[in-house]
Amino acid sequence: SEMKEIYLDRTEKNNSKWLELITDALKTSKRFEIHCWNEETDWIEFALKYGTLKESTWRYGKVIEGDVTPEFVTMILEMPKPTDIEIYNKMTPFFNIFLDDIKFQSCHYGTEIYIEDEMV
């Protein structure tokens, strides 16, 4: 199926548009995957409270997977917008968040979103 692409750039003052999109996707999602760079140790540790390490061929990072639980949803939706926005205007501290494999993809800290067309 087709993927719809949405880009959130520097003009976004907050992450409300990102939150709106992921809130919708979380309602029907069963599983999540979070990708963090190896040096993002705090976020890896944090994500591991909600899932487990997945075997991955990505040498430069870690992949955490788990069930979309009410606790996970709350964590994602209540996470404040990051303030380290020099490189990316980050919407989330997590590099990638995938829901139900690739049905919903929040990439590059939420600056690029891909949504399966049925969901739009």
Regions from the PLM with identified roles:
Residues 1-120:
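Structured alpha/beta or helical-core interaction and ligand-binding surfaces enriched in interleaved
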